[in-house]
Protein backbone atom coordinates (compact mmCIF):
# COMPACT_ATOMS: atom_id res chain seq x y z
CA UNK A 1 0.00 0.00 0.00
CA UNK A 2 2.65 2.45 -1.09
CA UNK A 3 0.20 4.81 -2.77
CA UNK A 4 -3.10 5.75 -1.21
CA UNK A 5 -5.89 6.57 -3.64
CA UNK A 6 -6.83 10.21 -3.76
CA UNK A 7 -10.40 11.36 -3.62
CA UNK A 8 -9.61 13.82 -6.38
CA UNK A 9 -8.63 11.11 -8.85
CA UNK A 10 -11.34 10.52 -11.39
CA UNK A 11 -12.77 11.47 -14.74
CA UNK A 12 -14.59 14.55 -13.49
CA UNK A 13 -13.13 17.68 -14.98
CA UNK A 14 -13.26 21.06 -13.26
CA UNK A 15 -15.96 23.32 -14.76
CA UNK A 16 -13.41 26.12 -15.28
CA UNK A 17 -11.28 23.85 -17.48
CA UNK A 18 -14.16 22.79 -19.78
CA UNK A 19 -14.80 24.14 -23.26
CA UNK A 20 -18.05 25.96 -24.01
CA UNK A 21 -19.77 22.88 -25.47
CA UNK A 22 -18.59 20.69 -22.58
CA UNK A 23 -19.96 23.25 -20.09
CA UNK A 24 -23.27 23.41 -21.95
CA UNK A 25 -23.57 19.60 -22.00
CA UNK A 26 -22.56 19.39 -18.33
CA UNK A 27 -25.19 21.93 -17.23
CA UNK A 28 -27.88 20.39 -19.48
CA UNK A 29 -27.26 17.03 -17.81
CA UNK A 30 -27.55 18.65 -14.39
CA UNK A 31 -30.83 20.40 -15.13
CA UNK A 32 -32.50 18.78 -18.16
CA UNK A 33 -35.79 20.73 -17.84
CA UNK A 34 -34.16 24.14 -18.34
CA UNK A 35 -32.96 23.51 -21.93
CA UNK A 36 -36.35 21.98 -22.78
CA UNK A 37 -38.13 25.04 -21.37
CA UNK A 38 -35.80 27.35 -23.27
CA UNK A 39 -36.43 25.45 -26.50
CA UNK A 40 -40.23 25.53 -25.96
CA UNK A 41 -40.11 29.28 -25.19
CA UNK A 42 -38.09 29.89 -28.36
CA UNK A 43 -40.63 27.94 -30.44
CA UNK A 44 -43.47 30.00 -28.91
CA UNK A 45 -41.67 33.27 -29.75
CA UNK A 46 -41.01 32.12 -33.33
CA UNK A 47 -44.67 31.11 -33.83
CA UNK A 48 -45.83 34.42 -32.32
CA UNK A 49 -43.51 36.36 -34.65
CA UNK A 50 -44.80 34.44 -37.69
CA UNK A 51 -48.40 35.18 -36.74
CA UNK A 52 -47.61 38.88 -36.19
CA UNK A 53 -46.12 39.03 -39.72
CA UNK A 54 -49.12 37.29 -41.24
CA UNK A 55 -51.48 39.60 -39.36
CA UNK A 56 -53.15 36.93 -37.20
CA UNK A 57 -53.39 38.88 -33.94
CA UNK A 58 -55.32 36.26 -31.95
CA UNK A 59 -52.83 33.44 -32.61
CA UNK A 60 -49.92 35.84 -32.02
CA UNK A 61 -51.43 36.82 -28.65
CA UNK A 62 -51.97 33.13 -27.78
CA UNK A 63 -48.33 32.28 -28.56
CA UNK A 64 -47.07 35.29 -26.60
CA UNK A 65 -49.07 34.04 -23.60
CA UNK A 66 -47.56 30.59 -24.14
CA UNK A 67 -44.14 32.25 -24.18
CA UNK A 68 -44.77 33.92 -20.82
CA UNK A 69 -46.05 30.67 -19.30
CA UNK A 70 -43.16 28.63 -20.68
CA UNK A 71 -40.67 31.23 -19.50
CA UNK A 72 -42.17 31.04 -16.01
CA UNK A 73 -42.04 27.24 -16.09
CA UNK A 74 -38.41 27.42 -17.20
CA UNK A 75 -37.56 29.75 -14.31
CA UNK A 76 -39.34 27.43 -11.86
CA UNK A 77 -37.38 24.48 -13.30
CA UNK A 78 -34.17 26.49 -13.00
CA UNK A 79 -34.78 27.41 -9.35
CA UNK A 80 -35.95 23.91 -8.42
CA UNK A 81 -33.00 22.34 -10.23
CA UNK A 82 -30.57 24.70 -8.51
CA UNK A 83 -32.07 23.85 -5.13
CA UNK A 84 -31.96 20.10 -5.79
CA UNK A 85 -28.50 20.20 -7.35
CA UNK A 86 -27.19 22.45 -4.56
CA UNK A 87 -28.48 20.02 -1.93
CA UNK A 88 -27.03 17.00 -3.69
CA UNK A 89 -23.77 18.84 -4.23
CA UNK A 90 -23.55 19.59 -0.50
CA UNK A 91 -24.19 15.92 0.25
CA UNK A 92 -21.57 14.92 -2.31
CA UNK A 93 -19.13 17.43 -0.82
CA UNK A 94 -19.70 16.06 2.68
CA UNK A 95 -19.15 12.52 1.36
CA UNK A 96 -15.95 13.66 -0.35
CA UNK A 97 -14.81 15.30 2.89
CA UNK A 98 -15.53 12.07 4.78
CA UNK A 99 -13.57 10.09 2.18
CA UNK A 100 -10.69 12.56 2.43
CA UNK A 101 -10.67 12.24 6.22
CA UNK A 102 -10.74 8.45 5.92
CA UNK A 103 -7.82 8.56 3.47
CA UNK A 104 -5.88 10.84 5.85
CA UNK A 105 -6.57 8.45 8.72
CA UNK A 106 -5.41 5.48 6.64
CA UNK A 107 -2.27 7.35 5.64
CA UNK A 108 -1.60 8.30 9.27
CA UNK A 109 -2.07 4.69 10.41
CA UNK A 110 0.12 3.50 7.55
CA UNK A 111 2.89 5.93 8.55
CA UNK A 112 2.59 4.84 12.19
CA UNK A 113 2.91 1.21 11.12
CA UNK A 114 6.01 2.03 9.06
CA UNK A 115 7.53 3.92 11.99
CA UNK A 116 6.77 0.99 14.32
CA UNK A 117 8.40 -1.43 11.90
CA UNK A 118 11.40 0.88 11.57
CA UNK A 119 11.75 1.01 15.36
CA UNK A 120 11.59 -2.78 15.51
CA UNK A 121 14.27 -3.02 12.83
CA UNK A 122 16.49 -0.55 14.68
CA UNK A 123 15.96 -2.47 17.92
CA UNK A 124 16.89 -5.75 16.21
CA UNK A 125 20.03 -4.12 14.80
CA UNK A 126 21.01 -2.88 18.27
CA UNK A 127 20.41 -6.33 19.76
CA UNK A 128 22.45 -7.95 17.00
CA UNK A 129 25.27 -5.44 17.55
CA UNK A 130 25.18 -6.07 21.30
CA UNK A 131 25.20 -9.82 20.70
CA UNK A 132 28.19 -9.46 18.34
CA UNK A 133 30.08 -7.29 20.80
CA UNK A 134 29.26 -9.70 23.65
CA UNK A 135 30.40 -12.64 21.51
CA UNK A 136 33.61 -10.77 20.71
CA UNK A 137 34.17 -10.07 24.42
CA UNK A 138 33.53 -13.72 25.26
CA UNK A 139 35.92 -14.79 22.49
CA UNK A 140 38.62 -12.49 23.86
CA UNK A 141 37.94 -13.74 27.38
CA UNK A 142 38.12 -17.33 26.14
CA UNK A 143 41.41 -16.63 24.37
CA UNK A 144 42.73 -14.98 27.52
CA UNK A 145 41.69 -17.96 29.64
CA UNK A 146 43.24 -20.37 27.14
CA UNK A 147 46.47 -18.38 27.23
CA UNK A 148 46.38 -18.39 31.01
CA UNK A 149 45.76 -22.15 30.98
CA UNK A 150 48.74 -22.69 28.65
CA UNK A 151 50.87 -20.50 30.86
CA UNK A 152 49.83 -22.51 33.92
CA UNK A 153 50.46 -25.76 32.09
CA UNK A 154 53.85 -24.51 31.03
CA UNK A 155 54.67 -23.54 34.64
CA UNK A 156 53.52 -26.87 36.01
CA UNK A 157 55.49 -28.83 33.44
CA UNK A 158 58.64 -26.73 34.00
CA UNK A 159 58.38 -27.09 37.79
CA UNK A 160 58.36 -30.87 37.59
Curated annotation (Swiss-Prot):
Residues 5-96 form the HIG1 domain. It is a multi-pass membrane protein. Keywords: Coiled coil, Membrane, Mitochondrion, Transmembrane, Transmembrane helix. It is found in: Mitochondrion membrane. The keyword Disulfide bond does not apply. The chain crosses the membrane at residues 33-50, 63-85. GO terms for cellular component: mitochondrial membrane. It comes from the Eukaryota. Pfam families: HIG_1_N. Residues 135-160 are annotated as: Disordered. PROSITE patterns: HIG1. GO terms for biological process: mitochondrial respirasome assembly. Its main location: mitochondrion. InterPro entries: Hypoxia_induced_domain, RCF1. Residues 86-160 form a coiled coil. Cytochrome c oxidase subunit which plays a role in assembly of respiratory supercomplexes. PANTHER family: HIG1 DOMAIN FAMILY MEMBER 1A (PTHR12297:SF3), HYPOXIA-INDUCBILE GENE 1 HIG1 -RELATED (PTHR12297). Associates with the respiratory chain complex III/complex IV supercomplex. Belongs to the RCF1 family. This is Respiratory supercomplex factor 1, mitochondrial.
Amino acid sequence: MSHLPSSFDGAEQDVDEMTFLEKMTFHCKQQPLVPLGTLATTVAVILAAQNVRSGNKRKAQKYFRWRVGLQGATLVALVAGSFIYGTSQKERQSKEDALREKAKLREKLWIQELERRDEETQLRKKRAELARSRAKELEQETQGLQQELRDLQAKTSSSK
